[in-house]
From Swiss-Prot:
The keyword Ribonucleoprotein does not apply. InterPro entries: NqrA (IPR008703), NQRA_2nd (IPR056148), NqrA_C_domain (IPR022615), NQRA_N (IPR056147). It catalyses: a ubiquinone + n Na(+)(in) + NADH + H(+) = a ubiquinol + n Na(+)(out) + NAD(+). Composed of six subunits; NqrA, NqrB, NqrC, NqrD, NqrE and NqrF. One of its GO terms (molecular function) is oxidoreductase activity, acting on NAD(P)H, quinone or similar compound as acceptor. Its EC number is 7.2.1.1. This is Na(+)-translocating NADH-quinone reductase subunit A. NQR complex catalyzes the reduction of ubiquinone-1 to ubiquinol by two successive reactions, coupled with the transport of Na(+) ions from the cytoplasm to the periplasm. NqrA to NqrE are probably involved in the second step, the conversion of ubisemiquinone to ubiquinol.
Length: 447
């Protein structure tokens, strides 16, 4: 077991009850193009077209053969583009339940499939896009093979669902998915789970189980990769979400594309935080209708630390998100707030009274409690960074745009979510995730 000592479990109110309920009927779903790093789409449909679930909507020009398929049947109601015609979203108005059938196999045949068969099946169904590389967090190039594959069967994000509750309902499909993944690598398939949890064991010795304990980010796949299979420019691993492993298992044994998604709807502005069964790319306005407290709320696809805020073109459940978080928009001004004791404000430092109430849960809002200023190294970053990385030095070099030094300090091991806690505790209010992405893109382009 690997024990994580550094980190932070955010004391936020509104944790979900770990019970699964059916969510409301969803009338619009979307694929969000900006979730796929470096992807350039070649559109295969246009507005007004009728599509079936599993039908290809667009192909990646940079990776021919990588198809992005419809998560539901219906009509293409909008194709939204941003600056320089960057694809933002493809919106589908859900109608009926027609779907593309796929070839399927008996459970005992899965272990005999070739890697070419598995890759072809994943590519044509669109489930290949559930895989991501580390470094760079991109969709893998068809034909490539990773040193290992990681599945995080634990989640330490604030307000997250317990993955074991979800996996327990589909344990057979989960194990079938693991069998399929073993055909894609000569290395290990690492299943990482929380210490003390009962996990259904796979009989294939290629599948290994690793226990992690401690505060967030103990549940992040970046943490697991760092301790088990550190990456570099010459060593690449893949990772995939546990619900996508279930979908892969169902694809190969049933011949259908499963786009179900169980998410935690939680946060201080949710009336009854709970786990909801919905569908991939679901409209957030439809998913949260009638379930929120009155007021000006911010709906976030994903975690409050690293998720994506609701907007007109991004108001849908993200491909890689397992939760929907809702907090209050902090638009009001506070007179002399900087001299108040701050009983209801949380801080990692001893600057507010809230710091001393260890068991208190706080109704966090979007307030930043101050403006941007110079980066101040007072030890906050080191307190929440469990990886063997010089946090302050790395963050400084990221802000300075020093790619050589950032690479030497370990930035290739990181994704935006790995620096979310550094952003949260930063006295200078810097957003380190986008800065990291710019540096990674530059490193990749320069080779």
């Amino acid at each position: 077991m690997i024990k994580i000592k550094k980190g932070l479990d955010l004391p936020i109110a509104g944790a979900p009850v770990q019970t699964i309920q059916d969510g409301p009927a969803i009338h619009h779903v979307a694929l969000l193009g900006e979730e796929y790093v470096g992807m350039r789409p070649s559109m295969l449909v246009q507005e007004g077209d009728q599509v079936k679930k599993g039908q290809a909507l667009f192909e990646d020009k940079k990776n021919p053969g990588v198809l992005f398929t419809a998560p539901a049947s219906g009509k293409i109601s909008a194709i939204n583009r941003g600056e320089r015609r960057v694809l933002q979203s493809v919106v589908i108005e859900v109608e009926g339940d027609e779907q593309i059938p796929f070839e399927h196999y008996a459970a005992e045949e899965l272990n005999q499939l070739s890697d070419e068969q598995v890759q072809h099946h994943l590519l044509t169904s669109g489930l290949w896009t559930a895989l991501r590389t580390r470094p760079f967090s991109k969709t893998p190039v068809p034909g490539s093979r990773p040193r290992a594959i990681f599945i995080s069967a634990m989640d330490t994000q604030p307000l997250a669902a317990d993955p074991q509750v979800i996996i327990a309902t589909e344990s057979e499909a989960f194990n079938h998915g693991l069998t399929v993944l073993t055909r894609l690598t000569d290395g290990k398939v690492h299943v990482c789970h929380a210490a003390g949890q009962a996990v259904t064991r796979h009989t294939n010795t290629q599948v290994t189980y690793n226990e992690f304990s401690g505060p967030h980010p103990a549940g992040l796949v970046g943490t697991h990769i760092h301790f088990l299979e550190p990456v570099s420019q010459t060593k690449m691993v893949w990772h995939v979400g546990y619900q996508d492993v279930i979908a892969i298992g169902k694809l190969f044994t049933r011949g259908e594309l499963c786009t179900d998604r169980i998410v935690a709807l939680a946060g201080p502005q949710v009336n009854q935080p709970i786990l909801l069964r919905t569908r991939l790319g679901a409209s957030l306005s439809g998913l949260t209708a009638g379930k929120l407290k009155e007021g000006d709320n911010r709906i976030i696809s994903g975690s409050v630390l690293s998720g994506t805020a609701f907007s007109a073109t991004h108001g849908y459940l993200g491909r890689f998100h397992q939760q929907v978080s809702v907090i209050r928009e902090g638009r009001e001004k506070e007179l002399f707030g900087w001299v108040m004791p701050g009983r209801d404000k949380y801080s990692i430092t001893r600057t507010t009274l809230g710091h001393f109430f260890k068991r208190k849960l706080f109704a966090f809002s979007t307030d930043m409690h101050g403006g941007e200023r110079a980066m101040v190294p007072i030890g906050n970053y080191e307190r929440v960074m469990p990886l063997d990385i010089l946090a302050t030095h790395l963050l400084r070099d990221l802000l300075a745009g020093d790619t050589d030094s950032a690479q030497a300090l370990g930035c290739l091991e990181l994704d935006e979510e790995d620096l979310a806690l550094c952003t949260f505790v930063c006295p200078g209010k810097y957003e380190y995730g986008p800065v990291l992405r710019d540096i990674l893109t530059q490193i990749e382009q320069e080779g």
